[in-house]
A protein has these predicted regions:
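Divalent metal-coordination and catalytic microenvironments
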Residues: 12, 30, 51, 62, ...
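Metal-associated gating/positioning segment near the N- to mid-region
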Residues: 50-120, 137
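Histidine/acidic-residue-rich, glycine-tolerant segments that coordinate divalent metal ions
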Residues: 99-111, 116-181
Length: 181
C-alpha cells in the first residue's frame, strides 16, 4: 500500500464564511487533516503561502452540463464543465437531472444524468431533480430520489414544455413538505 503525500501550507490567510485568519493547513492526500498555528509535520512537503488566500472548495449549486435545449446542447459537458469548475476553485457542482414528459419516471431521468456524469467529472457532483409530470408513479418515487441523495426538487412555472399545472404544483409541494424538502 502506498503512502499518501502530505503537504503543509504555512502562513496562509484562511478564509471561512465569517472570518479570515493567518494559519497553517496540513493536507494528507486529498484531505485537510489539521488547521492551526505553527503546525509541524516532518514528513510533509512545506509550501510557504504567506500573503495568499486559502478558501474551502466552492459549491456551484446551479449548473447545466450536457443539456439539450432549443435544438442545441450547452457548451460544457460534465468533463469540460467540471474541469473549468476546478480551475476556478469549485469542488462541488449540482446539476439538474430531469424527468422527461410522456410517462417517464424520475428514476429514468436520474439514470440518464448519471450516464452523462459518472466517470467524467473532475470534482464532486450531485443533482437537483426536475419534476415535469406528476402521477402516482412519480409520487411513489419521491422517497427513492431522497434515498439516492436528491435534496432539492425543481418545479417549472414557466417554459410550457416543462410546466406542471397549478393543481399538480400544489400536490407536489405538499408531498415534498411531508419529506421535509
Amino acid at each position: 500500500m502506498s503512502e499518501t503525500v502530505k503537504t503543509l501550507l504555512k502562513n496562509g490567510t484562511v478564509v471561512s464564511g465569517d472570518m479570515s485568519v493567518i494559519e497553517d493547513v496540513l493536507i494528507d492526500g486529498e484531505k485537510i487533516v489539521k488547521v492551526g498555528r505553527n503546525l509541524e509535520a516532518e514528513d510533509a512537503q512545506v509550501v510557504d503561502v504567506n500573503g495568499k488566500l486559502l478558501f474551502p472548495g466552492f459549491i456551484d449549486g446551479h449548473t447545466h452540463f450536457d443539456l439539450e435545449v432549443a435544438g442545441t446542447v450547452t457548451a460544457d459537458d460534465f468533463e469540460t464543465g467540471t474541469r473549468a469548475a476546478i480551475a476556478g476553485g469549485t469542488t462541488l457542482v449540482i446539476d439538474y437531472a430531469s424527468q422527461d414528459k410522456g410517462g417517464h419516471t424520475l428514476r429514468e431521468g436520474l439514470e440518464k444524468w448519471h450516464e452523462k456524469a459518472d466517470g467524467k467529472c473532475s470534482c464532486d457532483y450531485s443533482f437537483h431533480m426536475s419534476v415535469v409530470e406528476w402521477n402516482e408513479e412519480t409520487e411513489r418515487e419521491i422517497q427513492d430520489m431522497i434515498n439516492e441523495g436528491i435534496t432539492s426538487f425543481k418545479l417549472y412555472m414557466t417554459y410550457p414544455a416543462m410546466i406542471v399545472d397549478d393543481g399538480d404544483l400544489y400536490k407536489i409541494i405538499k408531498k415534498l413538505n411531508e419529506y421535509g424538502c
